[in-house]
Amino acid sequence: MAYSYLIVGSGLTGATIARQLLDAGKSCLVLEKRPHVGGNVYTRLVDGIHVHQYGAHIFHTNHEALWRYVHRFVHMNRYTNSPIANYQGQLYNLPFNMNTFYQLWGVRTPEEAQRELERQRAQAALAHPPRNLEEQALQLVGRDIYEKLIKGYTEKQWGRPCRELPPEIIRRLPVRLTFDNNYFNAEYQGVPKEGYTALIEKLLDGAEVRCNTDYLADRAAYDALAERVVYTGCIDAFFDDCFGPLAYRRVRFETERLEMPNYQGNAVVNYTDAQTPYTRIIEHKHFTFGTQPYTIISREYSAEWKPGEEPYYPINDEKNQRLYQRYQALADKRPNVTFCGRLAQYRYADMDVAMEEALRTADELLRS
């Protein structure tokens, strides 16, 4: 056969696996349906600004080895994710911390904040376990935070009332009794100075990459080219949606250049009221501390997904999980195909988790 491995998808998972296989002397053909590599971490250089084409991506990890691995290919900056929430024109720091509590209630000490949190939690006390997301959130943080910073944003994100969403979506909500706006607790955090596309291109260096190529459109011909297949696309599509499609949410972006040096003063601002149609605005230059006299922003809208559109977030409710398990049972009967990545495994994964799992998968492939 012409190649040792056929890798379907050039996102973070596929590219990381390719790098490990290539370093072990294996030949790889990578097929990408989109006109560019990188999947959803793809960044496009526009007028000197790296635009996160599919939404904000901030790499974070507690594992030094993974941080060093990424540094083999790109230079990571020291960007720290400190998003802001805009509720009806009022600004609040995220995650929920002493700055947030001061902005909400005027409290200045952890003791005052804890007392108010406990008071509001007690008001929301239930005689039964939380049955939906609203009850869960009220139990965790009380009504003020729920109404201003969770409810509207979450309902826009998922397209349904919080009372109809499962409580498992927010198993926990971090509450910090310190003045700390760092969203992630990870020891290492940053964004590639050269953009994420540069990272993907370095990971894929040495592989044959074919963009604008739909593996599923001519599967038999592509399978004949390699000894083994690594598939990172939608698992239901692989099996021709034989049990019906899995459900996702999609995201739509409106991106524009503005002739001003600074639009919102922060990379990410969430709009948490129900009246604002978009969920957040991203100002891309702030990810890499840009100083250009202009800026580029993206408004992010969450919407229902239909087959043929780009899937973003899996809807991991009970119905879809049962459906996924049926597809997984079919995948288990394909020993020559490795299914990995967020779409093939129907779950959300942070970038560090995706890369670590890709590294483990590559190691297993090389040992098999």
For each of these PLM feature ranges, what is it?
Residues 3-30, 362:
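N-terminal Rossmann-like FAD-binding beta1-loop-alpha1 element of flavoenzymes
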Residues 9, 80, 209-215, 341:
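Short loop/edge segments at beta-strand edges and connector loops
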Residues 22-47:
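Glycine-rich FAD pyrophosphate-binding loop
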Residues 47-123:
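Dinucleotide-binding Rossmann-like beta1-alpha1 core, especially the glycine-rich loop
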Residues 69-72, 145, 264, 276:
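Structural/interface elements that position substrates and couple domains in central-metabolism enzymes
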Residues 88-92, 98-228, 232-234, 239:
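Active-site/ligand-binding neighborhood in enzyme catalytic cores
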Residues 216-330:
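Mid-domain catalytic core of redox enzymes
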Residues 310-368:
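C-terminal catalytic lobe of FAD-dependent flavoproteins
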